[in-house]
Amino acid sequence: MAYNNSVRKRKKDIQDANGFHRDQTIDKKSRATNKLEESLPTFKVFIVLFFIRLLNSLTIKTFFQADEYYQCLEPAYNFVFGSGYITWEWEEGIRSSIHPLIYALGYKMVSYVHFDDKPIILIPKVIGALIASIGEVYLYKFSKKFTKNEKLARLTLILSLLSPFNWYIITRSFSNSFEMVLTTIAFTYWPWDNVISYKDISMSCIIAFISCIVRPTNGIIWLYLGINFMIKNYKLEKQSGKLMKLILILSIELILILLVNTGLDYIFYGKTTFPLYNFVEFNVIRNLSIFYGVAPWHFYLFQGVPIILMTYLPWLLHSAIVLKKYKSLLGQVAILMIGGFSLIDHKEIRFIYPLQPIFMLMVAYSIHETKHKFQRLYKFLVPVIIILNLIIAIFFTQVHERGVIDIVQYLRNNPDIESFGFLTPCHSTPWQSHINNPNLVNKSWFLTCEPPLHLTTTSLKEIKSYRDESDQFYDNPAQFLSEHFQSFADSRNTGASNWPSRLIIFEPLENFMDDFLRGSNYFECERFFNSYFHWDDRRKGDIIVYCQI
């Protein structure tokens, strides 16, 4: 009997022990689950994101598009130092000053200190990293608010960080990148549940109004969301009074923002001008935007969206089609914006970049819904996708089109250069915002591409018949050079020359220039790798520098 009691006691002890360990395991899982459901601390997230995006920004060695410099850094540099290159857009006043003024503030800070060239190059990168990291903090907040799911919010943030297109463009000084960040912030405060909250809606619309001033086409998003919100609340009883109050508040906000913006534009331009009206007149009334290229209606479907998404594209398609997220309000916004931009003749990939927060969230939805069903496949796919994204990001930020940045560093760091000229398509490189040498302002030039501003209305036929300076050169390089420069014989006889000490070309012109310069005092002195391929045949291959003896 004593033996049986002893056995029972031992069994009970074992059961108690097993139960304790089991409860411990449950407690651990419960704590882990609770921890995963807790929101991440905003400041810590921002600090981590800022250092990631600062690394991103500081390591970019390549060129993407000219607007990164000529629609932001050059006018900002000119505002502070007086020698940035001002394109026709700023002469005509079709751009808001808000975006370049942010960078001008950075330039102004470093102007108070005696410095070398490095801070001038670095300060825009720091500002770009700051803007990007704020945007991704709000991407996390927006995803959490919209889905009410912490795991989805974190996944959306991770996808954004691992996106090769984001790594390529998000920290650059494009107004589209700034627009995307503003859109994400405004999304965060938007009442997706259609509940009237004066505080949140006011904050959302303040950011949305600024975004539309920076990029007027962003209004497509906010007109649709606003109309949708009004209709749904109008149908509810006893909401008309609240709606009228909301409309009054937002009207006052808009008027105040427009007044402040007009003041900023006056300070920046030195005169009273209305960029929003000028933008509409240039792009809509006169339709001069087609001067910069016309793309087919399906450009965004088959080029824009796939390039922005890259390796994430299958998950976006799954989310939109299989999970039917195209029916959601965010899906409707994306469809409307892509459809609206598809109707505009002039198209560029970055024009739909403000849809990136929607794309990232839809991709996260797809992964969240399929990861358990295809668990074994994901164990293989995840590292493959990460590696592919890294390869793409490294190639486009370190290799593709790095020569046009290297040549500017060469010009900046070589004190023996007295003058230089670019026989290349217009705006192929940054200018004074990177060269930072006021002594060379009047001794340097590139071929320009001013649009036909003299035309009051424009047809595609008229645009094709118009030849800007770059076109004139590439139509007949020999004739252009003969008309604009002294012959080498005349230069030797008179002892004077309007030829620069450095001539820079892209590789496709190499054979012509070698023949044209034969017998002159020029020789090839430097060559920089630029690209293996390029959408513009004139920009393929290396950058070549001819030095004058």
Swiss-Prot record:
BP-aspect Gene Ontology terms: GPI anchor biosynthetic process
Lumenal face of the membrane: 61-119, 176-205, 268-289, 350, 401-549
Signal sequence residues: none
Sites carrying sugar chains: N287, N442
Pfam family, one: Glyco_transf_22
Main location: endoplasmic reticulum
UniProt entry tagged with the keyword Transmembrane helix: yes
Membrane topology: Multi-pass membrane protein
Record carries keyword Endoplasmic reticulum: yes
GO molecular function annotation: alpha-1,2-mannosyltransferase activity
Annotated keywords: Endoplasmic reticulum, Glycoprotein, Glycosyltransferase, GPI-anchor biosynthesis, Membrane, Transferase, Transmembrane, Transmembrane helix
Cellular compartment(s): Endoplasmic reticulum membrane
Homology family: Belongs to the glycosyltransferase 22 family. PIGB subfamily.
Protein name per UniProt: GPI mannosyltransferase 3
